[in-house]
A protein has these predicted regions:
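Catalytic-center loop of serine/cysteine hydrolases
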Residues: 79-186
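Alpha-helical tetratricopeptide repeat
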Residues: 181-200
Length: 235
């Protein structure tokens, strides 16, 4: 090849590769979950309720991630943005704030909401927000048949299913759905997991490690707690 044409070849190759690169982008709708807010709970240690703000979000993210048609944003990415931008510092997060966070993490939908635990009677209200318009598309309330604190995991599973439907996602395959229903995380383990996330966000690795381990002891097959333990230990 003549010298003057040699530099053109790599450039041409690069141009030819560009459509393939852009075509490989993830076009699935992004969903992100904000920390849930305590709507006025009684009967437990306050630290448990503070922790559930993270834990409910963490478990909903895990359940939504079962659907391959969605791109679910990691909880830590949302929390990092909230901390960096001091969003929701007053304890209140509205749809506009959620939409702002959603745009920053590249989500189409944001999930936000509140929970109330009145001496063991548990309720969760979730709101699905359109990131483009800041509009609340749907308020999804937990199944009134699942109101006991001991049924928290089943309650969150059912809530995630409804959020998938409201986000126009296809239902889970029967195989994935059956595997999900075969799993039931005890509330004790979920509480420990929530505490671990709280300490992780506070930068207390020792406490986070302790509570991830407690969650795994209470439920040895707790994949989310095992993954959390790897993150805080740097494995």
């Amino acid at each position: 090849i003549p010298m003057r044409h040699r530099s053109v070849v790599p450039l041409l190759a690069l141009i030819l590769m560009l459509p393939a690169s852009s075509g490989a982008q993830d076009t699935r709708p992004g969903i992100a979950v904000m920390p849930f807010q305590n709507g006025g709970s009684y009967g437990q240690d306050k630290e448990n309720f503070d922790a559930l703000e993270r834990g409910i979000a963490g478990m909903l993210i895990s359940e939504l991630s079962q659907n391959p048609a969605a791109r679910v944003v990691e909880r830590e990415n949302v929390q990092r943005l909230l901390d960096e931008q001091d969003l929701g510092a007053d304890g209140r997060v509205d749809a506009a704030t959620a939409a702002k966070v959603g745009k920053l993490v590249g989500a189409r939908y944001m999930v936000m909401g509140t929970f109330v635990d009145l001496y063991g009677r548990f309720r969760v209200d979730a709101r699905l927000v359109d990131v483009e318009t800041s509009e609340i598309l749907k308020v999804v309330r937990s199944d009134p048949k699942l109101e006991k604190r001991e049924e928290m995991f089943r309650l969150l599973q059912a809530l995630a299913e409804r959020l998938m439907a409201e986000s126009k996602l296809p239902p889970l395959s029967s195989e994935v759905s059956q595997a999900a229903k075969a799993r039931n995380v005890p509330t004790e383990a979920l509480t420990y997991y929530s505490r671990a996330l709280l300490y992780q966000d506070r930068g207390d690795k020792a406490k986070a490690t302790e509570y991830f381990n407690k969650a795994i002891t209470a439920f040895p097959n707790y994949a989310e707690a095992q993954e959390g333990l790897k993150k805080v230990s740097g494995a």
